[in-house]
Structure formats: structure tokens, C-alpha cells
Amino acid sequence: MAGNNFGKLFRVTTFGESHGYALGGIIDGCPSGLKLNFEEINNELNRRKPGQSSIVTQRKESDEVIFLSGIFNGLTTGTPIGFIIKNKDHNSKDYFNLKEIYRPSHSDFTYYKKYGIRDYRGGGRSSARETVSRVVAGAIAKQLLKIYNIFIKAYVSSIGNLNFSENYNKLDLSKIENTPIRCPDIKLSEKMIYYINNIRKKGDTIGGIITCNIKNVPIGIGEPVFDKLHAELGKAMLSINAVKVFEYGSGFVGTKIKGSNHNDIFTNNETTKTNFSGGIQGGLSNGMDIYFNVGFKPVATIMNKQKSIDINFFKNQILVKGRHDPCVLPRAVPIVEAMSALVLYDNMLNNRVYKI
């Protein structure tokens, strides 16, 4: 299987399955001498881990990372950083009835057709459980970005039809972690939680939008033409499970605005009066805030009967068991941040070769 690596210079490889012994990763290209803050790494994992509230899956995983290499006396050595996270609370028997039946809108069908075999236990490699490794790597990338005063903040801005249109500059982003939904609008958060709980009781699921803001990115980060910064961010976001939409800057709204109103006019200090460009022009960062939206579909695993087919193309009814997220967005916030950090730091390293 190809496609398990991400990045060019700061390169991450992940491995493992949802119900296997462990998941893990290898980070290659991390500079030596970084004093790792393990508490921050664990905090990022806790933000992603299951069982943290009533509105996410009740699978209980400690998500404790075990580092195997690349670290000595708390400092990175410059060699590959290897790590694993053991799976401790998987009920594979809940999936036995899915052994020969395809779950609608899952990867069951496509994986089986491509490889001729599939791990039906929790989706195997295609499970969002894989993202735990991304969060570990992203947490280290965030610590490296902090050296350059670059900070990444993501939050839930929409669940179903519940959303707010406030610009991120008008929000108190320090409130993101004050509610389990990870939305900075406390009143809207309460409505979102109530809505998700009602969806869950009906055995259904719902999607939404995560907004991400990146501050203090230096001018000129990214590569022209095929490796534009927004293209790299888009690829990163679209690689996350359940993501269907990536929209940066003015996005679809910008298609309805005249150029005379949409152009970002420069000021005397090399900033712009507006930021419809989303902090990126010509594929390179322009020093303004980078911001984008990531749209998540409703989780495909619902707890109601559905029509499907088996591997012999006979019609079947399917009823999924197990513990699943009615809405992935609260746990996806740190994943969006992690993938953003991986893109940014990889491009920061690459940018060093252009000037003496």
C-alpha cells in the first residue's frame, strides 16, 4: 500500500490499524536539539482521543504515546523519531457481522476491490483511528513552529445548520476549549451539543465545518506552480477522514464579489487593508493571517438499518454495532491543527535553501 507518507523534508510515515496491536509513526527530518514538551504532546492527544464527552464515541483509549527512537534526555537527536500508541479498547466482535457486507459510504467496497482483502474490524487502516499518529507528529511540528512565533488555532464554526458568521478576528479563541464542542461561541456551543445528542439518540450522524487560523507566517513560504501553499494545505485537509470540502480565503463568497472590491489593497507597512486572499498570493504566504474552512460529511456509520450488498452482490440489510461518533468535528479540531503544522513546518524547512 502506497500513500502512507506525508511531507518532503519534515516527513511523516504512519502505520497500524484500528483494531491492531498498535498504531504509530516515524518522523524523519526533525532537527536536533529541540527540547520536547511531552505534556503538550499528551494534551494534543487528549483533545483527539475517544470517550472525552457524551457527544463522541465512547471507546476508551488512553492514547499514551511510547517513543522508540530519535529522542535522548528529552532532546531530539536529528535521527528518525519512532513512536507507537497501543490499542487497548477495541471490540472486534462488534464487526463480525460486517465481514462480507459493505457498509454504505465507507471504504469497505473500494478497499476490497483494490486489494482483494480488507480488515473489516473497525475499518482497519481506513479508520480515523489512524489520525492519532498525525496528532503526535503535528504536536512536535507545532513546538517547532512556536520557535518562529507561528500559532495555529482551529475551532468548530458549524454543525449541521447551526453556524455563526463572525470573523475569527472578532472571536475570543481562548474559549475554544471551554466546551466539548470546541466552538468559541458558548451559547451556540450549547445548541450544538443539544443538537448532536438528539441526532445520536435517533441513531444518526451529522457533519459540519472547522475553521482554522494561522498567525505570524513569514512572507514567501510555499512553492510556486504545483506546490502552492494553499494546494499543500488543501491536500493535507482532504486527506483527513470524512473531509469533503477545503475553502480558503474568501472561498465561494469571493466568486460573487467584483474585483474592485475583492482586491487586497496594500498599506505602507506591507500588510493589506483586507484579507480576501487568505494570507496567500501566488501560492506563497504574504504575511497576513492564513485562514480556511474544512467541511466534514456526516459520519457514514449510523446505528439504524440500511440496505446494502455483500461481496457476492446479494442484497442485504446491515445494522452496525459498536461505539461510533455521532459527529467527528469536536475530535477533528486537533487533527486539522496537526496537518496544518506539518505543512507549515515542512515548507519552512524548504524555504531555507533560497537565500544565503
From Swiss-Prot:
Its cofactor is FMNH2. NADP(+) binds at residue 48. Gene3D superfamilies: Chorismate synthase AroC. Homotetramer. GO terms for biological process: amino acid biosynthetic process; aromatic amino acid family biosynthetic process; chorismate biosynthetic process. The gene is aroC. Pathway: Metabolic intermediate biosynthesis; chorismate biosynthesis; chorismate from D-erythrose 4-phosphate and phosphoenolpyruvate: step 7/7. GO terms for molecular function: chorismate synthase activity; FMN binding. Transmembrane segments: none annotated. Reduced FMN (FMNH(2)). This is Chorismate synthase. Its EC number is 4.2.3.5.
